[in-house]
Amino acid sequence: MARSRAKDYDDKRRFILHRSAQLFAESGYVGTSMNTIADGCRVSKALLYHYYPDKEAILFDILSSHLEKLVAAIQKADEETTNPQTRLKTIISTLLERYRDADAEHQVQIASLKLLPKEKQQPLLAKERVLVDILADALAAARPSVSHKRVLKPLTMTVFGMLNWHYLWFREGGAMTRAEYADFVTRLVLAGAADAAAAVSRSNGKSKPASKGRQKELL
């Protein structure tokens, strides 16, 4: 007879995922064992194995759950307004707000997704691409001059860089609130994007490709 599922099964699973994310962020995925996770969660190894067969399954669930929440929140934010500038700010604000209390999950996403087998990486990378596509579309709508791929991709990833690494310096109660930082990033991007795109356009075609001999030197 199959073992019945406890009423608090989902709550315990979420706790295991969050605590495991903290442990992975602190000690690294490779340096964290199932024993460490069980001790960190204050549960027996037997109970931990009732939820997950190995730490690879835990890592996948941490990332899948984290990215699903981000995608759902950003998709909702993307539909809240048709004003291009407001739409961009709303998306940036939503991302920063979703990162609240999820620093560990976010660090694990950056550092450990690549440690999963390729077949398990694919659905997670697909979720990441959804986020990238939504932000890129919002940037292009807010500043049409950056819509060319040569400019849009670097700009999109630059914005993600400002948001994804904020946990290294941002402190609640510090110089800026999350809302203020979201406004700061939005204004910075809107003010500088057009000039940056124009500079790239002016330089486009001016640089000659390296000779074959020089290419060999560079390689």
Model-identified regions with their sequence ranges:
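C-terminal peripheral helix-coil segments that are non-catalytic and often amphipathic
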Residues: M1, E97, D101, V132-A141, ...
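Generic hydrophobic, amphipathic alpha-helix propensity
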Residues: K12-S20, I37, I62-I74, L135
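Helix-turn-helix
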Residues: A2, F15, R19, L23-A57, ...
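Amphipathic alpha-helical segments used for helix-helix packing
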Residues: R87, R100-E119, L168-W169
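Amphipathic alpha-helical packing segments from all-alpha helical-bundle domains
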Residues: E68-V71, K118-P144, K153-M157, E180-D183
